[in-house]
Amino acid sequence: MEPFLFCAACGMIWDKSEVETMARKTRVVRTELPAGRRVLAISDAHGNLPFFQGALKAAHYTPDDVLVLVGDLVEKGPDSLTLLRAVMELAQHNTVYCLNGNCDNLVREFAEEPGAVEDPFYDHYLKMWGDRCLLIQMGRAVGLDPRGPEDLPALREAVRKHFAPELAFLASMPEIMVTPDYLFVHGGVADEEQLEGLDAWRCMKNDDFLSQGHAFRRWCIVGHWPVTLYHPHVPSAAPLLLPDRHIASIDGGCSLKWDGQLNVLELPRTPGGDFRWYAYDGLPTAVALDGQIPSSDSVNVRWGRNVLEVLERGELLSRCRHLETGRELEVLNEYLYCDQDGVTRCEDSTDYRLEIAPGDTVSVVRRLPDRALVKKNGVTGWYFGRLGEKR
């Protein structure tokens, strides 16, 4: 048997013995959302404080609103500790429900599980994510600079000693929250009626959830799997709503995707009403001066399905063949990389041309001499017209 398990959505490698220690039952909170107040759901902030603040501003968040954080508040972002403390402070004064995601579980497991400091996973994870790891941020906050497995015992003691409030807050987060009309869970569940007996880890890390065919009576609000991974042709980070199955998937790829965003889903005030959404991507904006018709056929080369053959190298772009589809497209050179096996892959790339009208405001992902990679309403694509400054 292989000694490690690979987590597709977050790039973690889990030791099998570690997985066994986490085989506990899910914690379920059953409640009713406060009547007459706006409810906003956010998932997968991943330690990105500016995106969290920007998303709340985009949604015109006020203390009267109810905030539901659907997991993965921390890890993989530069501000995990700062964001965690900001949410702890926010929760003292406002109505905030925080759910446990697979990344939120990591620090608590490290601090509490017997044998954690001997587990090779933690050394691997800290080296993989470095400054973007909450454990590293905690260590440095108290003067430690963990670099290898020999530093883990001291790091564990420091986390236990200096971060008791943070550990308690993380430990308090349930995996599932259920109301009469909604079910909130980070990864996903197969059945909304038999929740208490479910394995907690599988609720937090449920890869490719929408492809499993589940449908619900309540609306099931999930994160974990960046929504662009569900789109084979046109990349989109906008919340993905499936009314016929009552599922809303809202992970916009914040901190993980180069064109990612943090989404805020506003729930309908009454059952059967319309959802609204807001987002923040931190990108510069510009105004399109020329119109452009959209592509009729395109490909979204996305994580996990991104093996390429480089056909011709250019100065900024390279002509590549996407091996899964056989399609040829131009890929930004800075997006190309080789994995540990020497296989050429790329960050999420596309040949899609956005539909643009003169005067449209777009987010600029990359600007090249003859084109720009831009976003409009959460959709990423190429624009070959002129861009002007936004006034």
Task: Give the label of every model feature segment.
Residues 44, 72, 87, 101-102, ...:
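Divalent metal-coordination and catalytic microenvironments
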Residues 147-247, 254-258, 270, 275-280, ...:
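Acidic, His/Gly-enriched loop-helix segments that form or flank divalent-metal centers
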Residues 303-332, 356-391:
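SH3/SH3-like beta-barrel superfamily modules
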Residues 276-289, 325-343:
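Short, basic/aromatic beta-hairpin or loop at an interaction surface
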Residues 76-174:
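Active-site neighborhood of divalent metal-dependent phosphoester bond hydrolases
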Residues 289-304, 311, 339-367:
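SH3/SH3-like (including bacterial SH3b) beta-barrel domains
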Residues 46-51, 75-78, 103-108, 191, ...:
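Active-site environment of divalent metal-dependent phosphoester hydrolases
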Residues 4-86:
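N-terminal active-site segment of His-dependent metallophosphoesterases
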